[in-house]
From Swiss-Prot:
HAMAP family recorded: Gas_vesicle_A
GO-annotated cellular components: gas vesicle shell; vesicle membrane
Annotated compartments: Gas vesicle shell
Location, primary (coarse class): other
Function of the molecule: Gas vesicles are hollow, gas filled proteinaceous nanostructures found in some microorganisms. During planktonic growth they allow positioning of the organism at a favorable depth for light or nutrient acquisition. GvpA forms the protein shell.
Name of the protein described by the UniProt record: Gas vesicle protein A
Similarity annotation: Belongs to the gas vesicle GvpA family.
Family annotation (NCBIfam families): PRK09371.1
GO molecular function: structural molecule activity
Domain of life: Bacteria
Keywords assigned: Gas vesicle
Regions that span the bilayer: none
Subunit structure: The gas vesicle shell is 2 nm thick and consists of a single layer of this protein. It forms helical ribs nearly perpendicular to the long axis of the vesicle.
Amino acid sequence: MAVEKVNSSSSLAEVIDRILDKGIVVDAWVRVSLVGIELLAIEARVVVASVETYLKYAEAVGLTATAAAPAV
């Protein structure tokens, strides 16, 4: 995947359209500990994409019901 560099400014609508078209994943992992005792652990994965984009990539990795169901 190539990175495109554009010198002109983009409107908010163009940025949102691009994010929904390509999708974005934010993966976070936080651990809070005090004196070696873990007090809090948070693990999160946030996916922002259009339904069409999500289904295209989810089916490719077997996350949809049609991809997981055995063929009869």
